[in-house]
């Protein structure tokens, strides 16, 4: 493939910070698309939903089901908008790199932002930190800290390790699936440039793989939201 990400380095108090401009661009595009979806699909709401309102209500019902399957609604209802936003954001992010890629020289500008491990690990870290925040807020600091020593005190180091492993698996699972899909699409696109025979040979596999990638991207968005709500329920529910 030989494609590189456009990087920008900044010296901050003697420490070099490196920014991936393509990931920043694609995250901005993703956020803008999700914002437009929210704006367009929630205009002129009616008691009897029709058209685009059916879609957005289905998203809300779907995420409500995810939350209800993990915790009581009186605790989980406050996370409803979080789940909806997370599902839409990750789904859109997973889809952006499928139709095409924008490459300037050897620099890749247009891709799925979730094909970058920094992005997915940042998302998973934010979600795990959010579970700790709500665990303390809803259960109290003392009760929350005690939960790490249950059922026996020597479980504490194992539960700390579990927090790190949950963060890694949540982020790397999403990254691995999306990155692998884009790599194969890139290889098929390269094959398509090898004359008429290569184009014909790559056309059908590319269409099939793009369809499969849409399915995988949708499933991965669902899994990320589901696991986030599972982790949240473990932190805010007294019976966990």
UniProtKB/Swiss-Prot annotation:
It comes from the Bacteria. GO terms for cellular component: plasma membrane; proton-transporting ATP synthase complex. It is found in: Cell membrane. CDD domains: ATP-synt_Fo_a_6. GO terms for biological process: proton motive force-driven plasma membrane ATP synthesis. The chain crosses the membrane at residues 21-41, 83-103, 116-136, 184-204, 207-227. It is a multi-pass membrane protein. PROSITE patterns: ATPASE_A. It holds the Pfam family ATP-synt_A. Keywords: ATP synthesis, Cell membrane, CF(0), Hydrogen ion transport, Ion transport, Membrane, Transmembrane, Transmembrane helix, Transport. Its main location: membrane. GO terms for molecular function: proton-transporting ATP synthase activity, rotational mechanism. Key component of the proton channel; it plays a direct role in the translocation of protons across the membrane. Belongs to the ATPase A chain family. F-type ATPases have 2 components, CF(1) - the catalytic core - and CF(0) - the membrane proton channel. CF(1) has five subunits: alpha(3), beta(3), gamma(1), delta(1), epsilon(1). CF(0) has three main subunits: a(1), b(2) and c(9-12). The alpha and beta chains form an alternating ring which encloses part of the gamma chain. CF(1) is attached to CF(0) by a central stalk formed by the gamma and epsilon chains, while a peripheral stalk is formed by the delta and b chains. This is ATP synthase subunit a. It comes from Macrococcus caseolyticus (strain JCSC5402) (Macrococcoides caseolyticum). The gene is atpB.
């Amino acid at each position: 493939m030989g494609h590189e990400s456009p990087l920008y380095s900044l010296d901050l108090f003697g420490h070099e910070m490196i920014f991936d401009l393509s990931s920043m661009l694609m995250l901005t595009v993703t956020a803008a698309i999700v914002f437009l979806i929210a704006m367009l699909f929630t205009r002129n709401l009616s008691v009897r939903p029709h058209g685009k309102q059916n879609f957005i209500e289905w998203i809300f019902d779907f995420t409500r089901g995810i939350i209800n399957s993990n915790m009581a609604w009186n605790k989980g209802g406050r996370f409803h908008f979080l789940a909806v936003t997370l599902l839409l954001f990750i789904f859109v992010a997973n889809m952006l790199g499928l139709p095409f890629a924008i490459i300037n020289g050897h620099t890749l500008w247009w891709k799925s932002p979730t094909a970058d491990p920094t992005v997915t690990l940042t998302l998973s870290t934010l979600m795990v930190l959010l579970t700790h925040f709500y665990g303390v807020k809803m259960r109290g600091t003392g009760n929350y800290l005690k939960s790490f020593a249950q059922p026996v005190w020597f479980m504490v180091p194992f539960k700390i390790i579990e927090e790190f492993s949950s963060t890694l698996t949540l982020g790397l699972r999403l990254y691995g699936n999306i990155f692998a899909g884009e790599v194969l699409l890139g290889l098929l696109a390269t094959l398509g440039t090898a004359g008429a025979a290569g184009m014909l040979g790559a056309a059908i596999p590319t269409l099939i793989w793009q369809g499969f990638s849409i399915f995988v991207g949708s499933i991965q968005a669902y899994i990320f939201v589901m696991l986030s709500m599972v982790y949240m329920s473990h932190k805010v529910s007294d019976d966990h």
